[in-house]
Amino acid sequence: FHWSLALTFLGSWITAEAGLEWASTHMFLGYMMLSLLLFRILWGFVGTRHAKFSSFLVSPRVFFSSLQYLFSRRSEDHIGHGPSGGWATVLIISVLLVQAISGLFISDDIFNDGPYHRSVSDGVASFMANMHHLNFNLILCLVALHLSAIGWFQFGKNQALTKAMLLGKKKGPAVLGIKSSQTLKA
């Protein structure tokens, strides 16, 4: 999921900058992103142990107390997302969802309209277009923060997050691992 979403975002950014001839590809990637996000939200409720929101969303008190570990070299290992990573995941999913949904209502005023552009007033379409463009800047800030956090955990805290993200495996007690799913075999 992660790499599909990252590549879809990168492709959307490139096609948005490349010009109108890439608008249909940009729209396709927007649909792809929306599909991935809806899948991830569903997977957050019915997926494997460490993918479920209930496994990594903590109370504000626990979140703020965990911040002391975030900026120290002392490590607090988590098999799945830690408290800050869990809430960052929800934030990133949310802003990408706003981006994908707002794109459904906008137009380039020349050739391409989102599928719901004509179903809303000009004021709503204008609001959605502004949101789509301003939200992109927020996404860039969150991507930079995400990459910085990965770098800090990788090099400052010596946690092999990059390897875990590439291979989908992280060292830890076997009891905390994901058991093979038998659901699809039925």
Feature names for model-found ranges:
Residues F1-A186:
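Membrane-embedded alpha-helical bundles that constitute the cytochrome b-like, heme-associated redox core
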